[in-house]
């Protein structure tokens, strides 16, 4: 029997969702960007959310509330402003909130007809969160010029909270950025050389934190979970010697294990270490054994990246020996920031009682942390509560409606042949050229068109029963007809139906497949004001009937041009949903691949000759350790190929990827064997194409020629330049012309203006190059 401990286990979390339970921040941001509210009103929304979130943390019994996790756009961008590190094109010498938004979103064209491009945006490790990439040049200087962190600490202290600030560490900040001057790089510039200057700014930050009476700072160095180059790994020792102060440092890691850097970590001038035992449970024993005796160990036991209820009973059993070994040096926390979790399960009033007992959102995870800590401290009521809390998970393990025999039979029948198309690309390309009759530089879009308020209201009315099915179908067909008419007017070559019926590219499929659970308010931030509402995989996945065929077939009936069928790929559906934790991700991907394979067959039978299977998430699913990546890529590629392999040779399979760095996965991208791949390249000025050029990628490519995430409307000349840059790296006969991504979040005015310039640019170059060829 466990006796009550005399040493209390300290509790905290690594961060909390910023957007609000009802996405209050999103709506305030967008009103501000549209000029509908003043900045003071936006600031008031942020303050109210922070105070609410701190109150929730305090009320749950956490020993610390976390400050510094709030961001107006992205926490890496917030760090850039804190350090006075703003791209010159946006830097007026006095960085403010509008500066931050310009860096993240770009600056619209002004009276001179010019605009300033946003900084690059890319995935935050292997999550679906995006951050704004810091830009580094050899003459960069850093100075603490943005007071948000200090203001929010003071704000929390004024409310009476015990505050633990969070700060992105200097090495991770540098690693997450990029050198932007090719000439400097050629001359040997490496952003790591900026570390001494950067550390001076960090010293100033810690001086200010000390003056605020801060005892502990959570300093995030997630890159320690990577297999770092030696120069980077070796830089940690000096960096932490330089920035040590009277403020205690909790060196914080997540998303994978750090035992491979343990010798270096234990020599750092810090006061404690946080590890993620949800992502990497096997590291725990080695780290407990090697931990300096004066350090605290913060164990990230409650999974911050999924919605499943923590198995507190088993966690208590696993961590009890750690508590006995470490005593009051043990802290309990979330595995990573709860940014990646929805806010509050209590809002989900439409879920069944059984289903509710399976889940915990961010607010509920606060109590999981404190309940587990109480149990580890020997509180008998807490130990009993942990046992009871885990019972729904035990009951689920044996539930017959979770594991379905028919699905298991199809999985067992998968063979290598199931993932191969009948003929090689070189042969398929000839069949497709004859069948499709497309011109040089064919123009298309990625799939979605603007989701107007009418579309959203009609979908909502249908979902709530205020609009009957017949009227809903009529309304959606009207929007499809409008989208087709606009595309015909623009003279695009390959059309799409616009996806008016889809709220989200993953949620739509989840709602139409068995084995998923949708939520009403399960929103998580993707970037800026963009939120997504991932469905939850709760059981084996089946398709009862075709999902996209009727809409696509209707759209095709309105035009003589080719209409693309639009599917979301198996790896992306997996990556953008909350997966089951009782089976492997590979098995879930295979289940999805089989149902999508059936959908491809049905689209083809309905007369659709081009089918796009989007896989924007394929890279973000990579394990962050390179040594673990091959196994993932093998099954991810297989899943895509199973989906596509039912297509005939004359059916053209497209795939789309956005915000991906391809160098490290180019062989796997080629192995997908898609006939056409469209990619995000405009923000990086086509630099992503270098990977395809170096690899001699054999199939067709559509590099994005304008950034749909920015309100800037690209000029025809700008697009011509990008296409010509692309044509220097990819044979022109294999080039497509398209935007970077779907156009769902844009309005029709800017969409049509941008697409008009895109089509004009393609036609001008088509005419020029065909004349030259003649």
UniProtKB/Swiss-Prot annotation:
Top-level taxon of origin: Bacteria
Binding site for L-methionine: 446-448, 499, 614
Keyword Cytoplasm part of the UniProt annotation: no
Documented EC number(s): 2.1.1.14
Binding site for 5-methyltetrahydropteroyltri-L-glutamate: 23-26, 123, 530-531, 576, 620
InterPro entries registered for this protein in UniProt: Cbl-indep_Met_Synth_N (IPR013215), Cobalamin-indep_Met_synthase (IPR006276), Met_Synth_C/arc (IPR002629), UROD/MetE-like_sf (IPR038071)
Active site (catalytic residues): 709
Reactions that this protein is recorded to catalyse: 5-methyltetrahydropteroyltri-L-glutamate + L-homocysteine = tetrahydropteroyltri-L-glutamate + L-methionine
Gene Ontology MF terms in the entry: 5-methyltetrahydropteroyltriglutamate-homocysteine S-methyltransferase activity; zinc ion binding
HAMAP family: Meth_synth (MF_00172)
PANTHER family reported in the protein's UniProt record: 5-METHYLTETRAHYDROPTEROYLTRIGLUTAMATE--HOMOCYSTEINE METHYLTRANSFERASE
NCBIfam families registered for this protein in UniProt: met_syn_B12ind (TIGR01371), PRK05222.1 (NF003556)
Similarity remark: Belongs to the vitamin-B12 independent methionine synthase family.
Protein name: 5-methyltetrahydropteroyltriglutamate--homocysteine methyltransferase
């Amino acid at each position: 029997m466990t006796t009550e401990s005399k040493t209390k286990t300290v509790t905290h979390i690594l961060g909390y969702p910023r957007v609000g339970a009802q996405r209050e921040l999103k709506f305030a941001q967008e009103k501000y960007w549209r000029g509908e509210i003043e900045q003071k009103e936006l600031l008031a929304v942020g303050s109210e959310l922070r105070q609410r979130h701190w109150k929730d943390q305090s009320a749950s019994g956490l020993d610390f509330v976390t400050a510094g996790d709030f961001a107006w756009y992205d926490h890496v961008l917030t760090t850039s402003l804190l350090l006075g590190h703003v791209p010159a094109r946006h830097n007026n010498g006095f960085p403010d909130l509008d500066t931050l938004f310009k860096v993240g979103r770009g600056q619209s064209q002004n009276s001179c007809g010019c605009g300033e491009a946003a900084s690059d945006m890319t995935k935050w490790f292997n999550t679906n969160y995006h951050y704004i990439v810091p830009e580094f040049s050899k003459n960069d200087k850093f100075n603490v010029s943005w007071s948000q962190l200090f203001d929010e600490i003071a704000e929390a202290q004024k409310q009476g909270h015990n505050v633990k600030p969070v700060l992105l560490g200097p090495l991770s900040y540098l690693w997450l950025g990029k050198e932007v001057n090719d000439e400097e790089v050629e001359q040997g510039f490496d952003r790591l050389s900026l570390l001494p200057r950067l550390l001076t700014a960090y010293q100033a930050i810690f001086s200010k934190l000390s003056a605020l009476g801060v005892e502990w700072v959570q300093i995030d160095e997630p890159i320690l979970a990577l297999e770092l180059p030696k120069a980077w790994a070796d830089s940690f020792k000096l960096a932490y010697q330089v920035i040590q102060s009277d403020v205690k440092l909790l060196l914080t890691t997540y998303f994978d294990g750090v035992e491979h850097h343990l010798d270096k970590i234990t020599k750092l001038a810090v006061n404690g270490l946080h590890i993620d035992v949800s992502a990497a449970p096997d590291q725990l024993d080695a780290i407990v054994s090697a931990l300096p005796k004066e350090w605290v160990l913060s164990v990230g036991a409650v999974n911050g990246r999924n919605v499943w209820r923590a198995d507190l009973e088993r966690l208590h059993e696993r961590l009890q020996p750690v508590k006995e070994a470490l005593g009051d040096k043990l802290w309990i926390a979330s595995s990573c920031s709860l940014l990646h979790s929805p806010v509050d399960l209590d809002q989900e009033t439409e879920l069944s009682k059984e289903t509710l007992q399976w889940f915990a959102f961010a607010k509920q995870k606060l109590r999981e942390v404190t309940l587990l800590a109480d149990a580890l401290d020997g509180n008998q009521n807490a130990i009993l509560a942990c046992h009871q809390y885990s019972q729904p998970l035990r009951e689920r393990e044996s539930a017959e409606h979770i594991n379905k025999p028919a699905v298991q039979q199809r999985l067992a029948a998968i063979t290598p042949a199931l993932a191969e198309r009948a003929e090689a690309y070189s042969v398929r390309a000839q069949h497709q050229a004859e069948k499709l009759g497309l011109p040089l530089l064919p123009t298309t879009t990625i799939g979605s068109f603007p989701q107007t308020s009418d579309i959203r209201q009609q979908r909502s009315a249908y979902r709530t029963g205020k609009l009957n099915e017949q009227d809903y179908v009529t309304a959606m067909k009207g929007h499809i007809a409008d989208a087709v008419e606009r595309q015909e007017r623009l003279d695009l070559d390959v059309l799409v139906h616009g996806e008016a019926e889809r709220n989200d590219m993953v949620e739509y499929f989840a709602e139409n497949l068995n084995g998923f659970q949708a939520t009403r308010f399960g929103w998580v931030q993707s970037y800026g004001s963009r939120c997504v509402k991932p469905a939850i995989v709760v059981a084996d996945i089946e398709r009862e009937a075709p999902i996209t065929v009727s809409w696509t077939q209707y759209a095709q009936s309105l035009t003589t041009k080719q209409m693309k069928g639009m599917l979301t790929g198996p790896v992306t559906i997996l990556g953008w949903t909350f997966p089951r934790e009782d089976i492997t991700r590979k098995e879930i991907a295979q289940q999805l691949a089989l149902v999508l394979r059936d959908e491809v067959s049905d689209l083809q039978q309905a007369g659709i000759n081009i089918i796009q299977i989007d896989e924007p998430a394929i890279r973000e699913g990579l394990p962050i350790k390179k040594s673990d990546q091959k196994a993932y890529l093998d099954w991810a590629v297989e899943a895509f190929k199973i989906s596509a392999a039912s297509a005939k040779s004359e059916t053209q399979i497209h795939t789309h990827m956005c915000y991906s760095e391809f160098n490290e996965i180019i062989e796997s991208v080629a192995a997908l064997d898609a006939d056409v791949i469209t990619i995000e390249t405009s923000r990086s000025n086509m630099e992503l194409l270098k990977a395809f050029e170096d690899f001699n990628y054999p199939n067709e490519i559509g590099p994005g020629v304008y950034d749909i995430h920015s309100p800037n409307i690209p000029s025809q000349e700008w697009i011509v330049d990008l296409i010509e840059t692309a044509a220097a790296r990819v044979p022109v006969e294999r080039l497509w012309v398209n935007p970077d991504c779907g156009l769902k979040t844009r309005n029709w005015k800017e969409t049509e203006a941008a697409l008009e310039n895109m089509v004009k640019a393609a036609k001008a170059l088509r005419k020029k190059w065909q004349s030259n060829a003649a």
